[in-house]
Amino acid sequence: LGIKALGDCTRHFQSVECGVAARLQGPFGTFLAGQTGGPSLWIAGGIGVTPFLAVLRTQPLPQPVRLIYLHRSSRDAAYLDELQALAEAQPYLSLAAVANADGMPDLPAVLPAAADLVGVDCYLCGPPGLLMAAVALLQTRGVAPHRLHCERFDFR
């Protein structure tokens, strides 16, 4: 499971020992359910990669997807080895794993240019600060609001 400790409830999951039986429900979101079938840009910040990973594990991609996975270091990059293997196996998946130990990545350098975003649906999942900065930049690069889909992870 990929559960980040963000508050009282999720912090308890970090101390559960291996082998302990637990009953969990969810996830309940519909974040990626409304994909249009055209090209997509997926932007994941840290453990925000999990909804994208769930899709990649269960079905082949029917359209081109560029996944930009932002993380602090390769040691902290959850599921990076699996994502790299999936990118090699899936012809429609392009993976860019970008480490930035200093916090916020250089989004203007990492995100695609405006010409590469025409007709692309953008799906973002990560910390609120990253989402706000990425959405603002994508909008300045011409991405219409109806093509921006965000999933924050702030369950506490």
Predicted regions and their residues:
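C-terminal helical cap/extension that packs against the catalytic core
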Residues: 8-10, 65, 72-125, 130-133, ...
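Short, flexible loop segments at boundaries between secondary-structure elements
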Residues: 72, 139-156
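Conserved beta-strand elements of the Class I
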Residues: 39-43, 123
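General small-molecule cofactor/ligand-binding pocket signal
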Residues: 23, 94-98, 149-151
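Ferredoxin-reductase
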Residues: 1-23, 32, 39, 70-74, ...
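Histidine-anchored nucleotide/phosphate-binding helix
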Residues: 49-60
